[in-house]
Curated annotation (Swiss-Prot):
The gene is rpsE. With S4 and S12 plays an important role in translational accuracy. Located at the back of the 30S subunit body where it stabilizes the conformation of the head with respect to the body. One of its GO terms (molecular function) is rRNA binding. It comes from Janthinobacterium sp. (strain Marseille) (Minibacterium massiliensis). One of its GO terms (cellular component) is small ribosomal subunit. Belongs to the universal ribosomal protein uS5 family. This is Small ribosomal subunit protein uS5.
Amino acid sequence: MAKMQSKMQSDKPDDGMREKMIAVNRVTKVVKGGRIMGFAALAVVGDGDGRIGMGKGKSKEVPVAVQKAMEEARRKMIKVTLKNGTLQHTVTGKHGASSVLMLPAKDGTGVIAGGPMRAIFEVMGVTNVVAKSTGSTNPYNMVRATLDGLAKMNTASEIAAKRGKSVEEILG
Protein backbone atom coordinates (compact mmCIF):
# COMPACT_ATOMS: atom_id res chain seq x y z
CA MET A 1 0.00 0.00 0.00
CA ALA A 2 2.79 2.43 0.89
CA LYS A 3 4.56 1.67 -2.39
CA MET A 4 1.37 2.37 -4.33
CA GLN A 5 0.82 5.72 -2.59
CA SER A 6 4.40 6.87 -3.10
CA LYS A 7 4.17 5.91 -6.78
CA MET A 8 0.90 7.81 -7.21
CA GLN A 9 2.35 10.90 -5.52
CA SER A 10 5.41 10.87 -7.78
CA ASP A 11 3.17 10.78 -10.88
CA LYS A 12 1.44 14.01 -9.81
CA PRO A 13 2.68 17.05 -11.72
CA ASP A 14 4.23 19.51 -9.26
CA ASP A 15 2.74 22.71 -10.67
CA GLY A 16 1.48 24.29 -7.45
CA MET A 17 -2.14 23.39 -8.14
CA ARG A 18 -4.55 22.49 -5.35
CA GLU A 19 -6.74 19.46 -6.04
CA LYS A 20 -9.96 18.34 -4.37
CA MET A 21 -12.19 15.36 -5.05
CA ILE A 22 -15.86 16.27 -4.98
CA ALA A 23 -17.45 12.86 -5.55
CA VAL A 24 -16.70 9.30 -6.63
CA ASN A 25 -19.72 7.27 -7.75
CA ARG A 26 -19.98 3.60 -8.59
CA VAL A 27 -21.96 3.21 -11.79
CA THR A 28 -23.40 0.08 -13.39
CA LYS A 29 -24.14 -0.74 -16.99
CA VAL A 30 -26.54 -3.65 -17.42
CA VAL A 31 -25.86 -5.79 -20.49
CA LYS A 32 -27.16 -9.15 -21.70
CA GLY A 33 -24.38 -11.03 -19.90
CA GLY A 34 -24.77 -9.23 -16.57
CA ARG A 35 -23.62 -6.00 -14.96
CA ILE A 36 -20.50 -4.02 -15.83
CA MET A 37 -19.25 -1.96 -12.87
CA GLY A 38 -17.37 1.29 -13.28
CA PHE A 39 -16.54 4.48 -11.41
CA ALA A 40 -17.20 8.15 -12.15
CA ALA A 41 -15.14 10.84 -10.40
CA LEU A 42 -15.71 14.60 -10.12
CA ALA A 43 -12.78 16.85 -9.16
CA VAL A 44 -11.83 20.52 -8.99
CA VAL A 45 -8.36 21.99 -9.42
CA GLY A 46 -7.25 25.55 -8.61
CA ASP A 47 -4.07 27.57 -8.25
CA GLY A 48 -5.09 29.46 -5.10
CA ASP A 49 -5.10 32.75 -7.02
CA GLY A 50 -8.42 32.76 -8.88
CA ARG A 51 -7.97 30.01 -11.48
CA ILE A 52 -10.41 27.10 -11.19
CA GLY A 53 -11.28 24.05 -13.28
CA MET A 54 -13.72 21.17 -13.02
CA GLY A 55 -13.30 17.71 -14.51
CA LYS A 56 -15.09 14.38 -14.74
CA GLY A 57 -13.41 11.03 -15.22
CA LYS A 58 -14.84 7.57 -15.82
CA SER A 59 -13.05 4.23 -15.63
CA LYS A 60 -13.27 0.66 -14.38
CA GLU A 61 -10.97 1.56 -11.44
CA VAL A 62 -11.16 4.46 -8.98
CA PRO A 63 -7.55 5.75 -9.28
CA VAL A 64 -7.77 5.93 -13.07
CA ALA A 65 -11.12 7.76 -12.90
CA VAL A 66 -9.68 10.24 -10.38
CA GLN A 67 -6.60 10.84 -12.53
CA LYS A 68 -8.76 11.46 -15.62
CA ALA A 69 -10.93 13.91 -13.65
CA MET A 70 -7.86 15.85 -12.44
CA GLU A 71 -6.39 16.02 -15.95
CA GLU A 72 -9.66 17.31 -17.42
CA ALA A 73 -9.94 19.89 -14.63
CA ARG A 74 -6.42 21.18 -15.47
CA ARG A 75 -7.39 21.50 -19.15
CA LYS A 76 -10.69 23.33 -18.51
CA MET A 77 -9.60 26.14 -16.19
CA ILE A 78 -11.18 29.58 -16.04
CA LYS A 79 -9.76 32.76 -14.50
CA VAL A 80 -11.77 34.64 -11.87
CA THR A 81 -10.54 38.01 -10.61
CA LEU A 82 -10.67 38.15 -6.81
CA LYS A 83 -10.74 41.27 -4.63
CA ASN A 84 -8.77 40.97 -1.35
CA GLY A 85 -9.52 37.25 -1.03
CA THR A 86 -13.24 37.57 -1.69
CA LEU A 87 -15.61 38.08 -4.64
CA GLN A 88 -16.02 41.34 -6.57
CA HIS A 89 -19.78 41.53 -5.98
CA THR A 90 -22.85 39.41 -5.21
CA VAL A 91 -23.40 36.86 -7.94
CA THR A 92 -25.82 34.02 -8.68
CA GLY A 93 -25.30 30.93 -10.78
CA LYS A 94 -27.65 28.28 -12.12
CA HIS A 95 -27.29 24.88 -13.73
CA GLY A 96 -30.16 22.46 -14.08
CA ALA A 97 -32.24 22.60 -10.89
CA SER A 98 -29.31 23.89 -8.78
CA SER A 99 -29.01 27.57 -7.93
CA VAL A 100 -26.28 29.21 -5.88
CA LEU A 101 -26.00 32.67 -4.34
CA MET A 102 -22.48 33.91 -3.54
CA LEU A 103 -21.84 37.04 -1.50
CA PRO A 104 -18.52 38.80 -0.83
CA ALA A 105 -17.58 38.96 2.84
CA LYS A 106 -15.28 41.11 4.97
CA ASP A 107 -12.01 39.85 6.47
CA GLY A 108 -12.40 37.30 9.25
CA THR A 109 -15.64 35.81 7.95
CA GLY A 110 -14.07 32.70 6.43
CA VAL A 111 -15.62 30.39 3.86
CA ILE A 112 -19.26 29.87 4.76
CA ALA A 113 -20.42 27.45 2.09
CA GLY A 114 -21.60 23.88 1.99
CA GLY A 115 -20.54 20.79 0.11
CA PRO A 116 -18.92 21.16 -3.29
CA MET A 117 -18.97 24.98 -3.11
CA ARG A 118 -16.58 24.96 -0.14
CA ALA A 119 -14.07 22.82 -2.07
CA ILE A 120 -14.23 25.20 -5.05
CA PHE A 121 -13.58 28.28 -2.90
CA GLU A 122 -10.71 26.57 -1.06
CA VAL A 123 -8.80 25.52 -4.20
CA MET A 124 -9.52 28.88 -5.83
CA GLY A 125 -7.98 30.87 -2.99
CA VAL A 126 -11.11 32.63 -1.71
CA THR A 127 -10.72 33.23 2.04
CA ASN A 128 -13.92 35.17 2.84
CA VAL A 129 -17.26 34.36 1.21
CA VAL A 130 -20.84 33.51 2.12
CA ALA A 131 -22.63 31.12 -0.22
CA LYS A 132 -26.05 29.47 -0.24
CA SER A 133 -27.28 26.73 -2.53
CA THR A 134 -30.93 26.05 -3.29
CA GLY A 135 -32.69 23.46 -5.38
CA SER A 136 -30.90 20.30 -6.40
CA THR A 137 -27.97 19.19 -4.25
CA ASN A 138 -26.49 17.00 -6.98
CA PRO A 139 -22.72 17.66 -6.68
CA TYR A 140 -22.20 17.93 -10.45
CA ASN A 141 -24.98 20.50 -10.84
CA MET A 142 -23.81 22.48 -7.79
CA VAL A 143 -20.25 22.69 -9.15
CA ARG A 144 -21.48 23.77 -12.59
CA ALA A 145 -23.83 26.37 -11.03
CA THR A 146 -20.98 27.77 -8.90
CA LEU A 147 -18.64 28.00 -11.90
CA ASP A 148 -21.45 29.62 -13.93
CA GLY A 149 -21.83 32.33 -11.29
CA LEU A 150 -18.08 32.90 -10.97
CA ALA A 151 -17.71 33.18 -14.75
CA LYS A 152 -20.38 35.95 -14.79
CA MET A 153 -18.50 38.07 -12.25
CA ASN A 154 -17.02 41.35 -13.54
CA THR A 155 -14.48 43.74 -12.06
CA ALA A 156 -15.35 47.42 -11.55
CA SER A 157 -12.97 48.36 -14.39
CA GLU A 158 -14.72 45.94 -16.81
CA ILE A 159 -18.13 47.40 -15.94
CA ALA A 160 -16.79 50.96 -16.30
CA ALA A 161 -15.35 50.15 -19.73
CA LYS A 162 -18.68 48.68 -20.92
CA ARG A 163 -20.62 51.76 -19.75
CA GLY A 164 -18.04 54.30 -20.90
CA LYS A 165 -17.59 55.71 -17.40
CA SER A 166 -14.73 55.95 -14.93
CA VAL A 167 -14.15 53.40 -12.17
CA GLU A 168 -14.84 56.07 -9.52
CA GLU A 169 -18.31 56.70 -11.02
CA ILE A 170 -19.08 52.96 -10.88
CA LEU A 171 -17.90 52.54 -7.29
CA GLY A 172 -19.86 55.62 -6.25
